[in-house]
């Protein structure tokens, strides 16, 4: 589990992803495949830490209700119980879920049309 959600990743992969996110410092992470949502929660929590680090370095106050970074999860079949659990999680403000195929041109266009700022329309 990662923060209460099952995660389907090897520990070594989790460490590698964390190192990559720290180095790249992305504003948006797009994940294909949601399953139970553990990886979405992992990515959202790592982005939350980046926001905290940025605020600390800048000497500004961080408002957790206004995240600067977000995660978008795309899955062809988001199970209702998994969607509900992800939407109820404290990291939900950082997560947007899109149901559809990640190779569908309409889904790709929707992703590209979204603003980079975090959304709360899980």
Describe the predicted segments one by one.
Residues 3-8, 12-122:
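S-adenosylmethionine/decaboxylated-SAM
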């Amino acid at each position: 589990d990662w923060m209460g959600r099952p995660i389907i990743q090897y520990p070594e992969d989790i460490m590698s992803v964390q190192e990559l996110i720290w180095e790249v410092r992305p504003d948006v992470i797009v994940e294909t495949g949601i399953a139970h949502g553990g990886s979405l929660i992992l990515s959202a929590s790592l982005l939350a830490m980046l926001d905290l680090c940025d605020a600390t370095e800048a000497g500004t106050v961080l408002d957790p209700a206004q995240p600067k970074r977000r995660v978008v999860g795309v899955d062809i079949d988001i199970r209702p119980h998994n969607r509900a659990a992800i939407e109820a999680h404290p990291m939900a403000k950082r997560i947007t879920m899109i149901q559809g195929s990640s190779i569908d041109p309409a889904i790709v266009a929707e992703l590209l049309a979204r603003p980079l700022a975090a959304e709360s329309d899980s």
